[in-house]
Each structure stands twice: as C-alpha cells, then as structure tokens.
Regions:
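N-terminal FAD cofactor-binding segment of flavoenzymes
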Residues: 32-71
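Glycine-rich FAD pyrophosphate-binding loop
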Residues: 9, 19-40
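Short beta-strand to alpha-helix junction loop
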Residues: 81-102, 154, 220-225
Length: 392
C-alpha cells in the first residue's frame, strides 16, 4: 500500500511525486512509456527555474526574446535580455526524463510501461489504480490517487471528475523537430497568429534544430483540417526567409490535442482523488503553454496530499486545499480572463490582435501588457481593452 499513487510522469506528475517523496511518504509514479516524446512546442518559461533550480546547470537553449505576428503579419517584437532571467526551449523527451529522474532521486518509486485504465474498488471506494503491462495487469493501491496522465486519460473519465473533451473545448496541434541550416534568431521564439482561431510557432532548439508547428482552436477545429493547416504553414512564403535550404531533415513529427478553455474548476478533486496538469486543463488558453502551470498544479497537489496524510484525514475537506492554493487560484482566475480574450482577439479575422500589435509598437505600456498577457497569462486592464476597441 502506497500513501499516494500518481498516474503520469510528465511535469505535473513528476513534481507532485517529488514533493510527496521529500515529505517522507511512500509514492508510486506510474508511466505508460518513458521513451515517448510528448508532442509540444517545448518553450519553457523562466518561472519553471523556481521549481527546478537544477536546470540552471544544464546546457539549455536560452530564450530572451519573442516575435509575434498577427494574421496580417503586423509584428510585435520584444526582448527581455538583461531585464529578467532567460526562458529556454527543450526537447520534451529529454526534459521530461530530467524532471522524472529528480522525482526518483527524491524517493518516488517509478513504474514504467504501465498503462493506467481503471481504478481498484473496495466497498464502492476507489483504493488504487489498475494498469496493463507486457507481463499482465497490475494494481497499485494507495490512500490518495492522483490523475496526471494528460488529455486522453481514461482515469479522468472513470473518476467522473470530468467528461470527455468535446471538439469545441480543445486545440488541435501538429509539430515537428527539424534540422538544417537556418536564419532564425537563436535567442528568440516566434509566434504566427492566423486570421482564424489558431497560430503557428518556430522555436530554435540549438544552432541547427528547431521545433515548428501550428494549431487550431475551439470551433476552428471543425472548419480547418490540422494536417492541411500544417502543410500550409510550413510552406508559407513568409517563412521561407528563415529557411534557405530546399529540404530539411525531419527528426520527429506528431499531432496532439490540448485543453483550450483553462482549468475545469469542478474537476480538481473528489474524495481521495486529485487531478493535475493537462488532465485538469492547466494550459494557457491564449498561448497554449502548459508546462509551468502543470508544475504548479503538481506542487499544489503534492502539498495538499501531505496535509491530508499528516492530519490522517483524506476527504473533500482536506483536499479542497488544492483548489484554494494561492497559485492555483491565480492560474484559474487568469486563465478564465485570457480565455475570454481569445474570442475578442479573433473577431473580424483577427483585427483586434493586429491593432494590439500596432499599438504596442508605439505605446510602451500597451506593449508590456501585451507581453505579460501572452508570456505570463496576466489579464489586461479595462483601459487596455478600451484602447483596442476605440480603433475598430
């Protein structure tokens, strides 16, 4: 019997396992396949260094700037060099392995090649997690069960904490890691917003490798085929200026869904279960970035689990501490606001977004608000919105 069983060893699950193990409790960390590279752009905010100071010792690709383009290619460029700590870009296969190993070093017991598919029940109560392995089915019993296995989690549905995602609640993305000579600014990441609800990105990974991809959002998923959108994006004449070669080596490619409306408030906990990371919607509705928010959710759930175990009471009363955790409250609030901004920005073929970039190039205050909204999911002020509306 474990104190805590966690399904999923991504950023949320690994941080949660680390926190609980450091608290002196017995924790099982289950993973379906540690060699699977999660499809992702791989941009990581410098805020993550607060939770993983070990990353500073690694040779990561530093990012000190961002270039954003509206659907009509109005540009907003921003650099935070010498202002704040650099962010960085990563290959998710390597990044996830690093933070997983940190949780194992802290004392978490890791079980790879275990596909979670249901709960273990006793007297109608969920007391563990069932998995499928090459050797057969296994059961991991725990006092607290934590769902951290992403968008496609079977446990999320079986727990009844949330229903299956519908197409109008998610984003659909496709990306690739490519290699070859390029003219990208290695210090900056680039975002290319479309006239419909969607955007593309190019993130340098080193001198020659880069992550390139795109996604559609919400109802745009119905009117746009992600495979066609991807081909259109990588062949966009505007992007050719960065890529002088005729062909580039494709190292890896993948498609993936992600939650697009923020955190599902009523899906965070119940009885002896908590849900964290992508499973619970910890992805920014406006940028699609989810690594930082997922790590915060793992930290909060880990602290909450320790609180419940220390008080020898595992119930809604003790687990509600997770939802009221200060940083979780902040993320929930900010994501709700930025989700509403998505509708506003994409009105009239993205005209409001284009106007914002135009204003940001002439008004320092507007520029700072715009950057904080995209990079840190900070809600805009009423003055900011009124300025944009006045340009319509």
């Amino acid at each position: 019997m474990y104190d805590v069983v966690i399904s999923g060893s991504g950023p949320a699950g690994s941080k949660c396992a680390e926190v609980i193990a450091k608290g002196g409790y017995k924790v099982a960390l289950i993973e379906k396949n540690s060699e699977w590279r999660k499809p992702c752009g791989g941009a990581v905010s410098s805020r993550v260094l607060k939770y993983y100071p070990q990353l500073r010792k690694l040779n990561l690709m530093p990012v000190t700037g961002i270039n954003m383009y509206s659907g009509d290619y109005n540009q907003l460029e921003y650099s935070w060099k010498d202002i704040r700590e650099p962010s960085f870009t990563v290959d998710r296969l390597e990044f996830d392995k690093i933070i997983r190993n940190i949780s194992i070093e802290a004392g978490a017991e890791f079980f790879d090649k275990n596909l979670s598919y249901d709960f273990v029940y006793k007297n109608y109560k969920k007391i563990g997690i069932k998995t499928k392995t090459i050797e057969g089915n296994k059961e991991y019993l725990g006092k607290i069960l934590i769902i951290a296995d992403g968008m496609s989690s079977k446990l999320a549905i079986k727990s009844k904490l949330r229903n299956k995602w519908i197409i109008d609640e998610i984003g659909l993305c496709k990306c690739a890691i490519m290699e070859g000579e390029n003219l990208l600014n290695k210090d900056s990441i680039s975002l290319f917003f479309r006239k419909y609800k969607g955007y593309g990105w190019i993130f340098p990974l080193d001198e020659n490798r880069f992550n390139i991809g795109c996604g559609t959002w919400l109802e745009a998923n119905r009117s746009h085929n992600i495979n066609l959108v991807y081909e259109e994006f990588i062949n966009d004449p505007f992007l050719k200026r960065f890529f002088p070669q005729k062909e580039y080596k494709e190292i890896w490619k993948g498609c993936y869904p992600l939650p697009a409306l923020g955190v599902k408030d009523k899906s965070l906990f119940q009885d002896n279960i908590m849900m964290i990371g992508d499973s619970a919607g910890f992805v920014s509705p406006i940028s699609g970035e989810g690594i930082h928010a997922s790590i915060v959710s793992g930290m909060a759930a880990g602290d909450t689990a320790i609180y419940a175990l220390e008080n020898d009471e595992i119930s809604n009363r003790t687990l509600k501490k997770y939802r009221s955790y200060p940083n979780i409250k902040k993320i929930r609030r900010n994501f709700k606001m930025t989700a509403s901004m998505v509708e506003f920005f994409y009105e009239d073929d993205g005209k409001n977004l284009s106007n914002m970039f135009f204003l940001a190039n002439t008004d320092k205050k507007i520029r700072e608000m715009a950057i904080n909204m995209f990079l840190f999911s900070q809600p805009p002020t009423k003055e900011f919105l009124l300025r944009l509306k006045s340009m319509r």
